[in-house]
């Protein structure tokens, strides 16, 4: 009996535990669900709930009419958001294996961001810290998520352009980033991690030369100025 219960745990045959929450980390019934939502005590994945605001869904003029947002503007806005959050997660908490943003419209999925870290310890640290932070003028609600395999959580029909449920589908409709940004964030990341220790040594030597009156620290200061300008332009944390 125990083996059978273990085999059906989190599936549609399980009458006790919610299969949607187990697969997707969210359920449209919320706390009213008749089945249990077993929140994980440890996980590689965290969920930032309702943090992404899609301009195409929210932009309205003062008279209540919708403002047109072009596809190009939409992609630029989304890429900026994705890069900002991804970079913040890696710089403050640890290596990110995967990050996904829901483009659904249902209240339980709209704007959810799922960040899968390489280490569970980094995910735990991120949740504790992020729940004391704000983003874009709103408090962040972060929690550990049971989702580790996004292939199970995604709507396959949506990926093939055939989902008939639209934005209110209960499976994830993941919003893609541009190819250029994907290459930048994921393609170069491994090289960056391999060279990180060497970069620290070079920066240390540059600072030492700068204090000694040489000009070796100029490149580092210029990078800091560029980062500062970038944060002023798009920083919402």
Curated annotation (Swiss-Prot):
<feature type="modified residue" description="Omega-N-methylarginine">
    <location>
        <position position="165"/>
    </location>
</feature>
<keyword id="KW-0488">Methylation</keyword>
<dbReference type="GO" id="GO:0000398">
    <property type="term" value="P:mRNA splicing, via spliceosome"/>
</dbReference>
<feature type="zinc finger region" description="C3H1-type 1">
    <location>
        <begin position="12"/>
        <end position="40"/>
    </location>
</feature>
<dbReference type="InterPro" id="IPR035979">
    <property type="entry name" value="RBD_domain_sf"/>
</dbReference>
<comment type="subunit">
    <text>Identified in the spliceosome C complex. Heterodimer with U2AF2. Interacts (via RS domain) with PHF5A (via N-terminus). Interacts with ZRANB2. Interacts with SDE2. Interacts with SF3B1.</text>
</comment>
<protein>
    <recommendedName>
        <fullName>Splicing factor U2AF 35 kDa subunit</fullName>
    </recommendedName>
</protein>
<keyword id="KW-0507">mRNA processing</keyword>
<feature type="modified residue" description="Phosphoserine">
    <location>
        <position position="145"/>
    </location>
</feature>
<dbReference type="InterPro" id="IPR003954">
    <property type="entry name" value="RRM_dom_euk"/>
</dbReference>
<keyword id="KW-0597">Phosphoprotein</keyword>
<keyword id="KW-0862">Zinc</keyword>
<comment type="similarity">
    <text>Belongs to the splicing factor SR family.</text>
</comment>
<dbReference type="InterPro" id="IPR000504">
    <property type="entry name" value="RRM_dom"/>
</dbReference>
<dbReference type="GO" id="GO:0008270">
    <property type="term" value="F:zinc ion binding"/>
</dbReference>
<dbReference type="GO" id="GO:0030628">
    <property type="term" value="F:pre-mRNA 3'-splice site binding"/>
</dbReference>
<keyword id="KW-0479">Metal-binding</keyword>
<feature type="domain" description="RRM">
    <location>
        <begin position="65"/>
        <end position="147"/>
    </location>
</feature>
<dbReference type="InterPro" id="IPR009145">
    <property type="entry name" value="U2AF_small"/>
</dbReference>
<keyword id="KW-0508">mRNA splicing</keyword>
<keyword id="KW-0539">Nucleus</keyword>
<feature type="region of interest" description="Disordered">
    <location>
        <begin position="185"/>
        <end position="237"/>
    </location>
</feature>
<comment type="function">
    <text>Plays a critical role in both constitutive and enhancer-dependent splicing by mediating protein-protein interactions and protein-RNA interactions required for accurate 3'-splice site selection. Recruits U2 snRNP to the branch point. Directly mediates interactions between U2AF2 and proteins bound to the enhancers and thus may function as a bridge between U2AF2 and the enhancer complex to recruit it to the adjacent intron.</text>
</comment>
<feature type="compositionally biased region" description="Basic and acidic residues">
    <location>
        <begin position="220"/>
        <end position="237"/>
    </location>
</feature>
<keyword id="KW-0694">RNA-binding</keyword>
<dbReference type="Pfam" id="PF00642">
    <property type="entry name" value="zf-CCCH"/>
</dbReference>
<keyword id="KW-0863">Zinc-finger</keyword>
<feature type="compositionally biased region" description="Basic residues">
    <location>
        <begin position="188"/>
        <end position="208"/>
    </location>
</feature>
<keyword id="KW-0007">Acetylation</keyword>
<keyword id="KW-0677">Repeat</keyword>
<feature type="modified residue" description="N-acetylalanine">
    <location>
        <position position="2"/>
    </location>
</feature>
<feature type="modified residue" description="Phosphoserine">
    <location>
        <position position="61"/>
    </location>
</feature>
<dbReference type="InterPro" id="IPR000571">
    <property type="entry name" value="Znf_CCCH"/>
</dbReference>
<dbReference type="Pfam" id="PF00076">
    <property type="entry name" value="RRM_1"/>
</dbReference>
<dbReference type="InterPro" id="IPR012677">
    <property type="entry name" value="Nucleotide-bd_a/b_plait_sf"/>
</dbReference>
<dbReference type="GO" id="GO:0089701">
    <property type="term" value="C:U2AF complex"/>
</dbReference>
<dbReference type="GO" id="GO:0016607">
    <property type="term" value="C:nuclear speck"/>
</dbReference>
<keyword id="KW-0747">Spliceosome</keyword>
<feature type="zinc finger region" description="C3H1-type 2">
    <location>
        <begin position="149"/>
        <end position="176"/>
    </location>
</feature>
<dbReference type="GO" id="GO:0005681">
    <property type="term" value="C:spliceosomal complex"/>
</dbReference>
<feature type="modified residue" description="N6-methyllysine">
    <location>
        <position position="39"/>
    </location>
</feature>
């Amino acid at each position: 009996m125990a083996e059978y219960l273990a085999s059906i745990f989190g599936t549609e045959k399980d009458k006790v535990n919610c299969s949607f929450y187990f697969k997707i980390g969210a359920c449209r019934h919320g706390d009213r669900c008749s089945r249990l939502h077993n929140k994980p005590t440890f996980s590689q994945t965290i969920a930032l709930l309702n943090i992404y605001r899609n301009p195409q869904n929210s932009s309205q003029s003062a008279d209540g009419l919708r403002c047109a947002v072009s596809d190009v503007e939409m992609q630029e806005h989304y890429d900026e958001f994705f890069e900002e959050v991804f970079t913040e997660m890696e710089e403050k908490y640890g290596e990110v294996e995967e990050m996904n943003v829901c483009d659904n419209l249902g209240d339980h999925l709209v704007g959810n961001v799922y960040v899968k870290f390489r280490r569970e310890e980094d995910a735990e640290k991120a949740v504790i810290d992020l729940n004391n932070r704000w983003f874009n003028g709103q408090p962040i609600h972060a929690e550990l998520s049971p989702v580790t395999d996004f292939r199970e959580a995604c709507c396959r029909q949506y990926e093939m352009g055939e989902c008939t449920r639209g934005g209110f589908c209960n499976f994830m409709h993941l919003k893609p980033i541009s190819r250029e940004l994907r290459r930048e964030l994921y393609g170069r990341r491994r090289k960056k991690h391999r060279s990180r220790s060497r970069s620290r040594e070079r920066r240390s030597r540059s600072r030492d030369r700068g204090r000694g009156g040489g000009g070796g620290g100029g490149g580092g200061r210029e990078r800091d100025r560029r980062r500062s300008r970038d944060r002023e332009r798009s920083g919402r944390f």
